Amino acid sequence: TFSEKPAETQKSLGITLWSDNFDNPGNWTIDNSGQSGIEYGWNINNVSDGWYSANGINSTGGGNYAELVNGDPTQTPGTQALAVTYTLTTANPIDISALGGTNHVSLSFEQYGARFNDLQEIQISYDGVTFVTVGDNLDKSVLSASGGSAYSNPDVKSINLATTLPANP
């Protein structure tokens, strides 16, 4: 199979180094922890497949989006899988060393959803084996029967990586 590698080029500060709008699912590697079916784990398409929102994200990227689904807790009994880790990783490394020796890098993305007692982590890796958590969803309140709310649609998450990256990556 052919997988198009996203273009990576040197950029000035304040310029996008890499972006993706999920139009090519081959840019991503999905590990759904042995779960199968559209109702478990990550999927990339233009359809909202989850139980919570039929509308999906109001993304400025248009087209496809990546969506994480874990069963349906509103059914009796609930169908969500327990003790699983779902991962979505870029298929090819994003070479930030192309910035010319600076660690002034931010990771920004749009998201929509809610925190249902689950932890969402954003991780980076220098070697593709060891990952470091650089962000999570603990800044969001839990949405439960006793209160809380979904994220804004879309919610823009921006993570400054300068504190994580070496001075000259």
Stretches with model-predicted labels:
Residues 75-99, 155-158:
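Short beta-strands within extracellular/lumenal beta-sheet-rich domains
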Residues 6, 10, 164-169:
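Short, intrinsically disordered, charge-balanced linker/junction segments flanking boundaries
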Residues 131-166:
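Extracellular carbohydrate recognition and processing domains
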Residues 4-76, 136, 148, 152-154:
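Extracellular glycan-recognition surfaces and repeat-rich motifs
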Residues 83-85, 94-108, 117, 167-169:
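Extended extracellular/luminal ectodomain segments enriched in beta-structured repeat modules
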Residues 115-121:
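Short coil-to-beta strand junction motifs in C2/discoidin
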